[in-house]
């Protein structure tokens, strides 16, 4: 994944859907990442603590600009925002305030969501489909 060694990295996924959260959880675990999945019933205290300790954050909450630079700890180096909320006159806005991150945390690599994560989702789904096909064939 991403051409990097993820062994020992801590990933936080804010989504438990079968389209985003669960497949990515499997991919990250298979790449020796420690994964925490956060969902709508996770306490705010736990969400805050997990985000502060994450190396990688993947969001899929569907809440525009829910997070900004203050939510992420110094360890965080990669954010993948899988959400996109359309706003009249604007292309779309994700869970993470992109402009805020670019201004205050230029050390973080962040997807802008719009036009990027849809491609990542498609690639992940195709990859999952190939893996299931191979398993069913007995490879």
For each feature predicted by the language model, list its residue ranges.
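Surface-exposed beta-strand edges and their flanking turn/coil or helix-capping segments
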Residues: 26, 50-52, 124-125, 135-139
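Rossmann-fold NAD(P)-binding glycine/threonine-rich loop
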Residues: 80-137
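Glycine-rich phosphate/diphosphate-binding loop of Rossmann-like nucleotide-binding domains
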Residues: 1-71, 78, 90-91, 98-100, ...
